[in-house]
């Protein structure tokens, strides 16, 4: 049965790993403190559609490697998340630190990325 299922789809991996940043309760608390209109927003809902980042996989063998990689770039990830909610920088937490980042986000690392599509990968430039 497994062979039949897998033959129905193209199956190959790509040379990337995935890092997912899942917001934690302090992130939700900040969102609600700035704008009470998403009053019914729950942590579960906030975590339903997290950003996922494809990264080169050869530098990360273990989840700890991915955590170190993210921690070296924490400011960028933090600002991306905050800007997705509020562009006005005066609303952003003023004293952001690596400790705050760790309190706000859970880092998930997925080393195996399967491409089950037969269509081309298209890169969209957001600049």
For each of these PLM feature ranges, what is it?
Residues 30-31, 124-126:
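Short, solvent-exposed polar/charged micro-motifs at secondary-structure junctions
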Residues 56-124:
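Amphipathic protein-protein interaction modules
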